Amino acid sequence: MAEDTYSHKMVKTNHRRCRTKFTEEQLKILINTFNQKPYPGYATKQKLALEINTEESRIQIWFQNRRARHGFQKRPEAETLESSQSQGQDQPGVEFQSREARRCRTTYSASQLHTLIKAFMKNPYPGIDSREELAKEIGVPESRVQIWFQNRRSRLLLQRKREPVASLEQEEQGKIPEGLQGAEDTQNGTNFTSDSHFSGARTW
């Protein structure tokens, strides 16, 4: 109860980015593109951003949210590449998609990760003010900070869902669950420790 009250106060006092509201015409363009290509590459997202006059990061988040609402699963890279290569000659559109430039994964230094992780432990749901302050402190765009926090929350939630099963199996073998020993995928914002303030899934 105390933790819930604490989280509520944090969210209430921390300003959040206003939700991007797209016009009917913008949504028509986005939905049409989504129906053809639910996993657009970086070049496509840049083109869409110019076409509807918004930031590329807003396009990326819109596609992420829409895929989540429609139950899309992240496609394995190997499967995607194999599919593109096998169909590329017969379908120019697929060939173009496979060659399309993608945004490079943001790589953080140890110092930047330390700052991000420390901030996450204090507040897993930072508002726009906190994210902009973090972005300025570590020298990256605010949109990268937002995505880092999103990835960290979703992966931590997934790990916690798996922990009960893993704990039971390891307990039967008399071992300590590996997932509870602090394994971390730092570049993607994933910390698997169980002492975080993270309290479950939440929609941005």
UniProtKB/Swiss-Prot annotation:
Report the protein name in the record: Double homeobox protein A
Q: Name one Pfam family in it.
A: Homeodomain
Q: Which UniProt keywords apply?
A: DNA-binding, Homeobox, Nucleus, Repeat, Repressor, Transcription, Transcription regulation
Give the compositionally biased regions (Polar residues): 81-90, 184-197
Any one GO cellular component localisation term in the record: nucleoplasm
Q: Which organism is it from?
A: Homo sapiens
What is the purpose of this protein?
Transcription factor that acts as a repressor.
What's the main place this protein lives? nucleus
Q: In which tissues is it expressed?
A: Expressed in embryonic stem cells.
Q: Which residues bind DNA?
A: 15-74, 101-160
Q: Would you identify the family this protein belongs to, as annotated?
A: Belongs to the paired homeobox family.
Its localization reads:
Nucleus
Asked whether the UniProt record includes Protein biosynthesis among its keywords, one would answer no
Region listing for Disordered, in residue ranges: 73-101, 163-204
One Gene Ontology molecular-function label: RNA polymerase II transcription regulatory region sequence-specific DNA binding
Which GO terms of type biological process are on file? regulation of transcription by RNA polymerase II
